[in-house]
Amino acid sequence: MLGWALTFLIIAILAGVMGFGGIAGTAAGIAKIIFFVFLVLLVLSLVANAIRGKGPKV
């Protein structure tokens, strides 16, 4: 039980440092870029499978 308390304490400290240190805004910007990159890759994959005549696996 003490191990879990220490683990969550460390996680809380790291979250506080990232949140108050300005890293959160940068991380959010990077996450948006990665989201759109993978969205484009998804669309390309769907188009490529449609051209080949393969349907999505269900």
Swiss-Prot record:
Record field: transmembrane: 4-24, 27-47
Main localisation: membrane
Localisation: Cell membrane
Membrane protein topology class: Multi-pass membrane protein
GO cellular component: plasma membrane
Cystine crosslinks: none
Keywords per UniProt: Cell membrane, Membrane, Transmembrane, Transmembrane helix
The keyword Transmembrane helix is annotated on this UniProt entry: yes
Membrane listed as a keyword: yes
Family: Belongs to the UPF0391 family.
HAMAP family per the UniProt record, alphabetical: UPF0391
Protein name: UPF0391 membrane protein Patl_4137
